[in-house]
Amino acid sequence: SQIGLLINASVTRDNFEPAVSVGVHDRLELPRHALNFDITNACLGFVNAMTVASTMIDAGAIDYALIVAGEDPSPWHRTAVRILNNPDSTREDVLAQFATLTLGSGAAAAVIGRADRHPEGHRIVGSVSRAGTEHRNLCIGGEADQGMNTDAEGLLKHGLELVAQAWEQAHQDGWEWNDMTSYVTHQISNAHTNAIIEAVGIERERIPLTFPKWGNVAAAALPMTLAECAPTYTKGDRILCMGVGSGLNTALLEIQW
C-alpha cells in the first residue's frame, strides 16, 4: 500500500500496448494511487528507472518505488536460428545475429524508498549519464518475427568511447570513482569487460561477471549481478553501476552499501 510508483524497465514484451507495467501492477494488486509506466531504453532501462524513481522520492512525490525487469528473448532466438538456417544466409547474417544468440532470460526487482526512513539502507548517491544517439542504428530490434540486427563491433567501439566520456565528466564534476569496492557493469562478454578495464583503468578483480552463467539478460543483467554480489558487500562499500544500452546511452550510478 506504500508503493507510489511502479516502473517496468524490460526490453522484451508480449505486446506493443498497453505498457507491461499495467500487468505487473494488476498481478501484484498494487494500490490505485500507484503510478505505473514502462521505461524502455535498451539494456540501460533499469539504471534509468532507478534514477527517475530516486529523483521522484527526493522531490517528495512518492515514498517508495518498485522497479522490475523480466526478460525472455526466446522468440528472438527462434528468429535468429531461422535466419541462420536459411541456405542463402551469409557471413554478414551470422555477424548480425550473433549478439541475439548471447541473450539470456531472467528477472530482477528493486524497492527504493526514502533514506530518512531507512538509514540502514543502501543509498543511491548520484549518477552521470551520456548520450551518443548518432549511433542509434548500430542495433535495431523489431518484432520477434523480424529479429534483431546488431553491429557488435561498432557497439563495442562507440559504447566504450561513451563510457569513457561519462567517466571523465564524472571526474570533472568531482566524483572519485577510481577506487570503488565493486564495479557492476552491463554483462555482455569478455571483450566488453576487457574494453571497460582499458577505457577507464579499473581492476579486473573488482568487476563481477555473470554473463558466463546467464548470458546478456538485457535490462535485468546489471540488477541481477548486483543481487548476486549483495551477500559479499558490507556497510560502507561503494558500488558503481556502469550501465550502457543500444542507442547509444550510458549511465554511471553510485550506491553506498
Regions found by a protein language model. Give the residues of each.
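Glycine/charged-rich beta-loop-alpha catalytic/anionic-binding loops adjacent to active sites
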Residues: 2-7, 28-39, 88-95, 144-147, ...
